[in-house]
Amino acid sequence: MNLLFHFLFFVGSLFNNTNGYKPGDVATDFSLKSVDGKMVSMSDYKNAKGFVVVFTCNSCPFAVKYEDRLNAFAKNYTSKGYILIAINPNDASVKPEDSFEKMQVRAKEKQFTFPYVYDEKQTIYPQYGATKTPHIFLLDKNRVVKYIGAMDDNADDAEMVKERYLENAIEALEKGIEPTPATTKAIGCSIKAKKLG
């Protein structure tokens, strides 16, 4: 009976973790293969002031609309100590356009100025609780989650953006205060999980 209780508690804890991180949680590091063939971890960046982990892909129209914005962000903020790491969480057997080889092509075409890595085993995105591409997680230098959601308030048109959620959250961190809002709704395509069986 005691064994059954422990088993049910363990199973229950698995389900409780499916929601992923919330602001204030500490995110675990990862080691994922980048399009240049190197393994990338947050621990590689010893002097980082924070990290922007964005789950994105090649195939989603919303993700494509944010590529130039992510490039511009990386150019502006990497020198300020905020490291952007883009993670493709999609399974290539479901979305062939999101294969590692196609990621390499896309990164070269768009001249990405940030690491673009592949969550091939699909172990990282569930930990974070990412559900869309794109889906952004801002972490401080200690990997404490500070903001989750959309980059800004206009997925369709960068010229019409009124609220820059991610940049505002970083400004809050720079001032030593908590970002408000700490969460927004991520707008994008659902992440394509590997089909079982």
Feature-to-residue mapping (PLM):
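Loop/turn elements at helix/coil->beta-strand transitions in domains of secreted/extracellular proteins
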Residues: A48-F51, S79-L84, Q111-P115, K141-N142
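N-terminal "domain-start" segment that seeds a small globular fold
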Residues: L14-S43
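Thiol-/selenol-based redox modules, centered on thioredoxin-like
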Residues: L138-G197
